[in-house]
Amino acid sequence: MISGVFVSYRSAALAARAIATFREEARLAGREAEAIAVVNSGDAAEREALVPHADRVLLPPRNLGFAGGLNAGIAAARGGTFVLANPDLLFCRGSVAALAGAAEAGGLLAAGPALYADGARSVLLPPAEEARPEELARRALAADPARTARVFRREARRAAAQAERAAAGESAFVRGLSGAVVAVTRAALEAVGPFDEGYSLYYEENDWQRRLLVLGGRLVYAGGAHVVHLFAQSTRREPRSAAWFAESEARYYETHFGEAGKRGLARLASCAPFEAPPLPVAGGLSWVDPAPAAVAISPFRHFRPFALALVPHGESRWTPPADLVAAHAGETLFVRAFARASGATLAEARFAG
């Protein structure tokens, strides 16, 4: 049996859709499945809204955080394989089969999918980075206007490689997976241990994945598993999110990297706010260079991290998908068209949702 564990926080409608697509994909794969929903809001109405959709709905007496919610759901589940998930997901055709197959391939493994920001799967979310002090250094470089272009070119190469894997349905061993959805067997969970509930929100997946890697386990990017992630639909409305992120980040780096982690955090904190010329507001991008192009989409002016849209050959125009715009209503997104071969900027703008 495959157990889907969905941790919901003021996201009942999203979680219901996620559960429905998970169930359908498990059915098409010929796999027995169950869905466990953990309602972290403490809202009995949210629990009742999910009762028709999940096999079990847990309503803890307090907010357990994402880590605690996963642990509670895992403890209540019966499956030998788990899909541990955010509520703001849509499982695409073949995704549950591909994730389960990758997680069950033998050995100490965890698997994650190709994540898209839109239903048409034209905008690929960024590759996960292994959270190490070197990653803090890259974030500091990205915040430096004199060095940000070099960091962007590296990210563009990684994103393009991931897009090609996803398009071809290819899998690869990686050093980090998004925590939005991870597939893992019960045996692997028992070997690595539960998620650390000291993380209120954020970095719980990095901590768990690092423990798996230290034990000799491997992380699999399952390019044949495509999942739409509407991204931060509950946390972006939570005023404590920024504080939780800072607390979890400090805890993770200091726990796993000691003084090197502290130095990396201090360097990042000392960076001046990123400054660059303002971009014009536009509803799309156009450019004249005929070279193969891609578009980066980011909430940050320095474009780190960014989602990637590959522009079809021969086209020199791009408009954001309507569902991406709707998911980020009220936010500003920065967009950059760039030459895929060189990373050179072709056009830039900002979208004010």
Please provide the spans of the model-predicted regions.
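Active-site-adjacent helix/loop segment of glycosyltransferases
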Residues: 209-282
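Conserved donor NDP-sugar-binding/catalytic core segment of glycosyltransferases
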Residues: 90-127
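A short, conserved alpha-helix in the catalytic core of glycosyltransferases
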Residues: 165-169, 175-193, 197-225
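Acidic donor-binding segment of Leloir-type glycosyltransferases
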Residues: 22-62
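Glycine-rich, basic loop-to-helix element that forms the pyrophosphate-binding segment
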Residues: 60-77
